Amino acid sequence: MRTATLYRYSVPMEAGVILRHQRLKSRDGLLVKLQQGELSGWGEIAPLPEFSQETLDQAQVAAECWLQHWVSGVESDDSVLPSVAFGLSCAQAELKQTLPLSADYRKAPLCTGDPDELFAVLQALPGEKVAKVKVGLYEAVRDGMIVNVLLEALPDLTLRLDANRSWSRAKADGFAKYVNPALRSRIAFLEEPCKTRAESREFAQDTGIAIAWDESVREADFQVEAEPGVAAIVIKPTLVGSLARCQQLVQQAHQAGLVAVISSSIESSLGLTQLARLAAWLTPATVPGLDTLDLMQAQVVRPWPDSPLPLITTEQLGVVWHR
């Protein structure tokens, strides 16, 4: 006997969470629960506005269609919508007990804004000091100066930077100009600095600052391959698709000598704990990019270890579909 339930959640965000062009006031998504006999499995379906190709309403329609088949005993292919494919594959993997329970709760702290705040966060980090800084929100020159100050002040720090394709080549060069060439090797990678892949490649080769592919990974013509100046690919499962697709990308990256980083698309605590398990399984040597829970005002169903945020339970969620 199979049953399935689809819940919808809405969690208020902290003030000041800005995506590409809009403020994100709440994080909205779906949780799916599959049940078969004594076993159950959960997954999260949460398209990220401005980044996902699908809307939440479109994802809900696709999920309901897939679940209708599943409860009838029909095994459907993965959804073509990445967030749906990811959430449903997680629920199936939990049900079949194929998603390992051990998790990598390390996170590269996400630093924005005040450099003084960054110092405090980074100096409190135990072990390997890896942090992520969003660049491209302010002036490129200012970003370069902040990165340089951080690397100078903390000699054991490695930074991951993310520009979200926000710079022209000239602005990217303006950033690099303010980062001491002797410190550039401690930039693990800069995600997609320029508006085109060609410009980003040239930037990496001209400046010695390694880059990573992020948005490119989700584009139809993208191939994982070793290239001069490219250090990593960033895999955001909500934007990429099923667990099998994520596994394929990680294997391709490792075969090409690239680092693969499992990264958050601002999922709820339930989705984040599953990403931590995925990271421990597929990329155990790499700190995942999962430091997004503190952008929210609550956790959902499953808590992240040691988080002080209140937990929303299943009883507090709206059921949008059940069979």
From Swiss-Prot:
Gene3D superfamilies: Enolase-like C-terminal domain, Enolase-like, N-terminal domain. It catalyses: (1R,6R)-6-hydroxy-2-succinyl-cyclohexa-2,4-diene-1-carboxylate = 2-succinylbenzoate + H2O. Pathway: Quinol/quinone metabolism; 1,4-dihydroxy-2-naphthoate biosynthesis; 1,4-dihydroxy-2-naphthoate from chorismate: step 4/7; Quinol/quinone metabolism; menaquinone biosynthesis. It is an enzyme of class 4 (lyase). Transmembrane segments: none annotated. Belongs to the mandelate racemase/muconate lactonizing enzyme family. MenC type 1 subfamily. PANTHER family: O-SUCCINYLBENZOATE SYNTHASE (PTHR48073:SF2), O-SUCCINYLBENZOATE SYNTHASE-RELATED (PTHR48073). This is o-succinylbenzoate synthase. It comes from Yersinia pseudotuberculosis serotype IB (strain PB1/+).
